[in-house]
Regions:
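A preference for well-ordered globular domain cores
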Residues: 1-188
Length: 188
């Protein structure tokens, strides 16, 4: 990535090589790939160095736009993020418009996963109800364990004190890899 700098101010960013003009001079797209760094710097085209230190997981945070600043000390353009803002944990209504918070969104995902696991065996429940034939106890036990795990996961989500605590529920660690939220049971 490169940037055009004029009087120590970034005037244009090139995410990939592309044709450009400076004054009356036109340059083909391959200029950025073929020319040396010194030759590019001579026409005020500088390498961009990305710093993602402040960038946070966009699932849980609202990141700022990238800020491009010419750094005369390094002779590069720094691409940095401002301080990320945590998304709302709880639902918020402003002027009659509801915006779902992270807890609602994540609990719905868990509900959808639970539904996806149970749906293929729903016919067994229907058959039992319609015909009176008993469902295999292994299926009953597994279905109950899926619902129990769903409720447990949602309780953990509700119990998360802040965005970082919620994000931590999904982080896999250790060997074997596990996460605090856990996993749904598998039908054997």
């Amino acid at each position: 990535m490169w940037a055009q700098v004029d009087n120590n101010t970034v005037t244009k960013v090139f995410p990939r090589p592309q044709a450009f003009s400076i004054g009356d001079n036109n340059y083909p797209a391959n200029t950025m790939s073929v020319w040396s760094e010194a030759n590019l710097n001579a026409i005020d085209i500088w390498e961009v160095v990305e710093d993602n230190t402040n960038f946070k997981d966009s699932e849980f945070y609202i990141n700022t736009n990238v800020i491009y600043t010419y750094n005369s000390g390094t002779g590069k353009v720094d691409a940095t993020y401002g301080t990320a803002t945590a998304k709302e944990m709880d639902d918020v209504t402003v002027d009659g418009i509801l915006t779902e918070g992270l807890k609602t969104i994540h609990k719905r995902r868990i509900d959808n996963q639970c539904n996806g696991l149970l749906a293929p065996s729903d016919w067994r429940v229907t058959k039992q109800e319609e015909t009176g034939s008993a469902m295999d106890s292994g299926w009953k036990t597994w279905r109950a364990s899926v619902r129990t795990k769903c409720n447990s996961m949602q309780a953990q989500i509700d119990g998360a004190a802040d965005v970082d605590a919620l994000a931590a529920l999904y982080e896999y660690t250790g060997d074997p890899r596990t996460r605090p939220l856990g996993e749904f049971p598998v039908k054997e």
